[in-house]
Amino acid sequence: MVYKIAIDGPAGSGKSTTACLLRKRLGYKTINSGSIYRAVAYVLDSTFKNADLESKNIRDFVNLLDFDMFKDEILYNNHNISNYLRSKRIDEYVSLVAKKLYIRKKVGNLQNKFIKCSDTGIIIEGRDIGTNVLPDATLKIYLDASPKVRAKRRFLERPDISYEDTLAGIIERDYSDKTREHGALVVAEGAIIINTDDMSTEEVVDKIFDLFQNKIN
């Protein structure tokens, strides 16, 4: 049996770090769905300047895209593009890319490809994992934190962008994620909400680990 853990939540809530540490604890494969969207955004931005996301040319290009994943790295044409996915430009562009239904379907297909490669367990983090990608997940988690706390965390990771700009970006992204037509950020049915404002990463991981053990035992 392949166990599945879905971790959803807004930008900066600690999904990626939590999933990475859980992977080390459980020995499961992890998928960062946000990185896949960022990879699509990066390839589109670097291949087509000012791409018309509604054009047939772009749709056909996206449908042929393929990526591979190795731990936390994303490979495109056998090149590791992970270091290019966290720029301010991609931060802004990915929210537009993620709104398009055909791109969401493509990312879903890629996620399913990665899921099939796992024979023990899978941890997927994103914004619509418990609702659309893994509705049958063994455990569904929704990580949350206040915008100010999330902005502080992001600023510590990327001090090249001011705290004020980081906070404004998070508030804007929250609105976009929660109001988009397809794959909106919501708490999945049956998900356990964990507010991480006053919790360390280790405390969050311990809590999810205990919840998972209770589920499977």
From Swiss-Prot:
CDD domains (UniProt xref): CMPK (cd02020)
Positions with a binding annotation for ATP: G9, P10, A11, G12, S13, G14, K15, S16, T17
EC number: 2.7.4.25
Enzyme class, spelled out: transferase
GO molecular function, one term: dCMP kinase activity
HAMAP family: Cytidyl_kinase_type1 (MF_00238)
Family of the protein in this entry: Belongs to the cytidylate kinase family. Type 1 subfamily.
Name used for this protein in its record: Probable cytidylate kinase
